[in-house]
Swiss-Prot record:
GO cellular component: autophagosome lumen; cytoplasm; cytoplasmic vesicle; Golgi apparatus; intracellular membrane-bounded organelle; nucleus
Expression triggers: Up-regulated during granulocytic maturation.
Catalytic activity from the UniProt record: L-seryl-[protein] + ATP = O-phospho-L-seryl-[protein] + ADP + H(+); L-threonyl-[protein] + ATP = O-phospho-L-threonyl-[protein] + ADP + H(+)
This protein's name: Death-associated protein kinase 2
Main localisation: cytoplasm
Encoding gene (name): DAPK2
General function of this protein: Calcium/calmodulin-dependent serine/threonine kinase involved in multiple cellular signaling pathways that trigger cell survival, apoptosis, and autophagy. Regulates both type I apoptotic and type II autophagic cell death signals, depending on the cellular setting. The former is caspase-dependent, while the latter is caspase-independent and is characterized by the accumulation of autophagic vesicles. Acts as a mediator of anoikis and a suppressor of beta-catenin-dependent anchorage-independent growth of malignant epithelial cells. May play a role in granulocytic maturation. Isoform 2 is not regulated by calmodulin. It can phosphorylate MYL9. It can induce membrane blebbing and autophagic cell death.
UniProt region (Autoinhibitory domain), positions on chain: 292-301
Domains (record comment): The autoinhibitory domain sterically blocks the substrate peptide-binding site by making both hydrophobic and electrostatic contacts with the kinase core.
Organism: Homo sapiens
Record-listed E.C. numbers: 2.7.11.1
Length: 370
């Protein structure tokens, strides 16, 4: 039996047994900077789960691994949540080098990969997926939990072999409980999806998730990314200037209702940005009359453009994400004088699958909308 590590007084201890004594560990599902996710089967029940092996930081001076505080924060949040659109935590084990989270197995793949394989998609169908995302975020926000890493890669399907698959929000490595009266600042997340207040190192709240939902919706309807530039400086400048538009090449078949939904999310001033409740009540999500409902049914997503632009976006992202993160980190270090070894966790969550391994084929052509 392994020695128990130092932990917060209120944190329920992690099991110190060998996870392999209780689970058969299978194939790798994904990997990140300091984490590997593998399929596993519980020996006592035969049920399948996902085992997330998080590499522990061994000392404050180390550049490798995740700090105890960050691991405990993720576990604490996962232990609080129970919602059909949010991944669930089954158990936690610990050994000398890793903390192992036994998570619900979400095996249907990414939502956007599923959409790219469809032959047609109306806005009505698209909003059924957005509504599930909003429902999951609404649950988190009622608990004052901000995800801070909402992006297509973290929106998964429980089972893709049904007409309207069940969405699961995953990866709570950057999630944070927002406390009233306590200022929270950080530079983290995936740059393409971060809100201006993150780039500018301003106080953060639940509003940052709403910005990310705006970016996700924009990409879902077009395949193009609203702020992704040819350089890291251009991307960050686009975000802080809220520089985007609805290029006719990508949005010729998009309804004004859908564009209005996006516009009201991609607002720089956090107080003027839609809240999760306001987003759920928006007529694109919840039509108030037959005319609005008909607009959603008759407006279609250009899936040919979506497939082409989404693949190009993924290719570009695989080459730009590291330099973007490094730029964000350097900016933060200048503002708050961080040690260089404190930056690694902040670029993105550690369960982010290695983007370079994905099947991206063509470079993306820069347009005025992205």
């Amino acid at each position: 039996m392994f020695q128990a590590s130092m932990r917060s007084p209120n944190m329920e201890p992690f099991k110190q047994q060998k996870v392999e004594d209780f689970y058969d560990i299978g194939e790798e599902l994904g990997s990140g900077q300091f984490a590997i996710v593998k399929k596993c089967r519980e020996k006592s029940t035969g049920l399948e789960y996902a085992a997330k092996f998080i590499k522990k930081r061994q000392s404050r001076a180390s550049r490798r691994g995740v700090s105890r505080e960050e691991i405990e924060r993720e576990v604490s949040i996962l232990r609080q949540v129970l919602h059909h659109n949010v991944i669930t935590l089954h158990d936690v084990y610990e050994n000398r080098t890793d903390v192992v989270l036994i998570l619900e197995l979400v095996s249907g793949g990414e939502l956007f990969d599923f959409l790219a394989q469809k032959e047609s998609l109306s806005e009505e169908e698209a909003t059924s997926f957005i509504k599930q995302i909003l429902d999951g975020v609404n649950y988190l926000h009622t608990k004052k939990i901000a995800h801070f890493d909402l992006k297509p890669e973290n929106i998964m399907l429980l089972d893709k072999n049904i007409p309207i698959p069940h969405i699961k929000l995953i990866d709570f490595g950057l999630a944070h409980e927002i406390e009233d009266g306590v200022e929270f600042k950080n530079i983290f997340g995936t740059p393409e999806f971060v809100a201006p207040e993150i780039v500018n190192y301003e106080p953060l709240g639940l509003e940052a998730d709403m910005w990310s939902i705006g970016v996700i919706t924009y990409i879902l309807l077009s395949g193009a990314s609203p702020f992704l530039g040819d350089t890291k400086q251009e991307t960050l400048a686009n975000i802080t200037a809220v520089s985007y538009d609805f290029d006719e090449e990508f949005f010729s078949q998009t309804s004004e209702l859908a564009k209005d939904f996006i516009r009201k999310l991609l607002v720089k001033e956090t107080r003027k940005r839609l809240t999760i409740q306001e987003a759920l009540r928006h007529p694109w999500i919840t039509p108030v009359d037959n005319q609005q409902a008909m607009v959603r049914r008759e407006s279609v997503v250009n899936l040919e453009n979506f497939r082409k632009q989404y693949v190009r976006r993924r290719w570009k992202l695989s080459f730009s994400i590291v330099s973007l993160c490094n730029h964000l980190t350097r900016s933060l270090m200048k503002k708050v004088h961080l040690r260089p070894d404190e930056d690694l966790r902040n670029c993105e969550s550690d369960t982010e699958e290695d983007i370079a391994r994905r099947k991206a084929l063509h470079p993306r052509r820069r347009s005025s909308t992205s």
